[in-house]
Amino acid sequence: MSKSEFQVIIVGGSIGGLTLAHCLRRAGIDHIILEKSSSPAPQIGASIGILPNGARILDQLQLWSEVEDYIEPLSTATIGLPDGFSFSSSYPQIINERFGFPIAFLDRQLLLEILYQRYPDRSKIRLEEKVTAVETSDSGATVTTSNGSVYRGGLVVGADGVHSIVRREIWRASKKLSSGLTAEFRCIFGISSAIKGLNVGEQVNALFDGLTIVTIHGKNGRVYWFVIQKLDKKYIYPNCPRYTKHDTTVAAEQLRNIQFYRDITFGQVWENRETASMTVLEENTFKTWHYGRLVLLGDSVHKMTPNIGQGANMAIEDAAALTNLLHNLQKISGTLSSTAAQIETILRQYRRIRYERVESIYRDSRFLVRFQARDGLLNILLSRYYAPYAGDLPADMASKTIADGVMCDFLPPPKRSGDGWKRYRRDGQLRGWRFHAMLCILMLAILYTWVGRTNLDSIVFSACGSLFQKLSVPT
């Protein structure tokens, strides 16, 4: 297959899929997107958090300036507990200052619209093309859609989400049939118009037992919100609950009277809703990322809860990392070879580059959703007796996660930046902090049984502070 014949077939016009198309276009690599929806930017009531590691890539692709028109950078986060105790952190503002890009939220629909409208050749984005079959061989890959169209290329990328047909074919072909995808939480999510008392640029995290209410207050007071609840048991994919609009309404009405911030109730958020939906929150990072000429990115291969805000950013990074490898092969060889051996080498490198980072962030996400839902005694203790006194620790931990992000190495780095990229980069040292965290948790349990809850405020902070302080020192 000659260079002119090599084509990347992207299954799914998701944020990851459209970002990959922009990356491939800038790298001069032929591609096409097959999207099952009739609209490139459907409104499903979801919001998207863009963190500096994702924003930096969008800036390289000359898309960030348009995204900025729709966002209000976060400056403050307030955390509230069931006993009425609350505290605030300026970690969002610190992140902005360190990296030159903010933590910000906007409608998922708006980001998709920007990615679609700013793509210059719409003929490469095929709507209403539902993929029904995917095949891979030594000589190429074939994709068939529901209308009978057949597409042939050198590589198929599954950017088709948690129910990925490309992943299903990888499992079948590689005989890896155990998914490992589980769900222990569900989420009601939506977008509401402005509510008096919820100030622009602020975020509220209200932590209850088995329940978390998160509101992010964006441009013009627009409220992006999540209500995360612990399920009655652990579900294993694909046998997870599916929810109707009626289910969403019933679940939301049951929470109507909960005061989550000062005198503001969830009922006020619900009454002001523009869109809302409910879904289970699947969790997993799959170990198998590719087979033959098939490869995965985004939610199709790593699914995490929204608490950490890195889901879309990981998909954006995946797109950049995969394009980097294809571009390097093209630069070295002068062509994109379609030999199975070279494709296999590229995909092995892609998985090796991405897996450890994604797995680390996935584990952070697993911890955070349980911490914010006060799931278990240890998380109750941490939320009440350590988190309020952690100072800049949340910003320092987030900085290390952000600084390790990849970008498009075939494009100039953004002109806007901050010293955080170099200062907090860990060069692959992703696991060290967990030892200290687990040790601190163990100490908390011992202290709890030793002194009881009465004196924990001072003792726990004193005993654990030195351990967590190690996390604040850039490596």
Curated annotation (Swiss-Prot):
Residues that carry a glycan:
N147
GO MF annotation terms: FAD binding; monooxygenase activity
Is the Ribosomal protein keyword given for this protein? no
Localisation per UniProt entry = Membrane
Q: Which species is the source of this protein?
A: Penicillium janthinellum (Penicillium vitale)
Lineage, opening ranks: Eukaryota, Fungi, Dikarya, Ascomycota, Pezizomycotina
Cited Pfam families: FAD_binding_3
Q: What class of enzyme is it?
A: oxidoreductase
Residue ranges annotated as transmembrane are 8-24, 432-451
* Protein name, as recorded: FAD-dependent monooxygenase janM
Q: Which GO terms describe its cellular component?
A: membrane
Keywords of the record, alphabetical order, are: FAD, Flavoprotein, Glycoprotein, Membrane, Monooxygenase, Oxidoreductase, Transmembrane, Transmembrane helix
Which cofactors must be present for this protein to function?
A: FAD
Query: Is Magnesium there in the keyword field?
Result: no
InterPro entries the record matches? FAD-bd, FAD/NAD-bd_sf, FAD_mOase_fung
